[in-house]
Design a protein with these regions (language model features):
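Short alpha-helical transmembrane segments in multi-pass integral membrane proteins
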Residues: 1-19, 77-144, 186-230
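Residue-level signal for short hydrophobic patches within transmembrane helices
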Residues: 8, 12-31, 35, 58-65, ...
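Membrane-helix interface/capping residues of multi-pass secondary transporters
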Residues: 37, 46-49, 86, 115, ...
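Interfacial/gating helices of multi-pass transporter permease domains
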Residues: 40-60, 126-131, 191-192
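Membrane-helix boundary and inter-helical linker elements of multi-pass secondary transporters
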Residues: 42-45, 79, 158, 185-187
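Small-residue-rich hydrophobic transmembrane alpha-helices
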Residues: 49-109, 146-165
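Hydrophobic transmembrane alpha-helices of multi-pass small-molecule transporters
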Residues: 61-64, 108, 176-180, 206-210
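Alpha-helical transmembrane segments of multi-pass membrane transporters/permeases
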Residues: 100, 155-178, 196-199
Length: 230
């Protein structure tokens, strides 16, 4: 199994090759909302466009929390992989999936409960707040997809593969744009359609990462014997 190894060869080029996809990936994750805004602004009017901007601010508060958690998980993955403890790596993956998934569900519920108070705190006009809430209810309902993409990306980063998660994200960006045009421009689903496009695109990124992991790094995916809560 070939992975990046900073202990061999020239270190600076290897650091750049590892860091650049990670940086671009973090930037691209913010572009889901930007793509939605472009399509909404063109096909759903100024109020919906303003709602997307407000929603992006609220959404990022919770996305940064998930991203930070997965960054911490990637450190644990890297420790297990660096010590060649693949059984430990797989069990960490299982525990991260279970407890990270539960944390994400709690975070989703908290986000939904705090949604209206946050929009009020931001002094959002009622017509804009209503549309922003329509968008965010779908986004927060699909927060598990965001978590599992970041978890898969953390697993890939821990073995030195930062490009594959980026490629999956690029494919999801293209799907998001296509689905936005279908749901908003063609089917007239408005701002909720843009949110569904984002969630479905994120699910695609998860599926692509899992397929790649199963094909390239099958020994990293947890098995029945790894499903222990200890």
């Amino acid at each position: 199994m070939e992975t990046a190894a900073l202990t061999r060869g020239s270190i600076p080029p290897q650091l750049v090759s590892l860091a650049l996809p990670l940086i671009f990936g973090n930037i691209l994750q913010q572009l889901y909302n930007t793509i939605d805004a472009m399509v909404i602004g063109r096909f759903a009017g100024e109020t919906a466009f303003a709602a997307i901007g407000v929603a992006g601010t609220v959404m990022n508060l919770f996305l940064f929390l998930l991203s930070g958690c997965c960054t911490g998980i990637s450190v644990l993955f890297a420790q297990q992989y660096g010590s060649r403890d693949l059984a430990g790596f797989r069990q960490e993956g299982f525990l991260a999936s279970v407890f990270g998934g539960l944390f994400t569900l709690v975070l989703s519920l908290a986000a939904l409960l705090l949604l209206r108070p946050l929009l009020t705190l931001m002094q959002t006009p009622e017509d804009v707040a209503r549309l922003a809430a329509d968008y965010l209810v779908v986004i927060f309902g699909g927060l598990l997809a965001t978590f599992f993409y970041n978890l898969c990306a953390a697993a890939l980063r821990s073995v030195g593969d930062t490009r594959s998660a980026l490629l999956a994200l690029l494919a999801a960006m293209a799907a998001n744009l296509a689905l936005d045009l279908l749901f908003v421009a063609r089917l007239g689903m408005g701002i909720a359609g843009a949110a569904w496009a984002t969630v479905l695109a994120q699910l695609l990124s998860v599926a692509l990462c899992l397929l790649y992991l199963a094909r390239r790094y099958p020994q990293l995916l947890f098995r029945r014997e790894d499903r222990r809560l200890d």
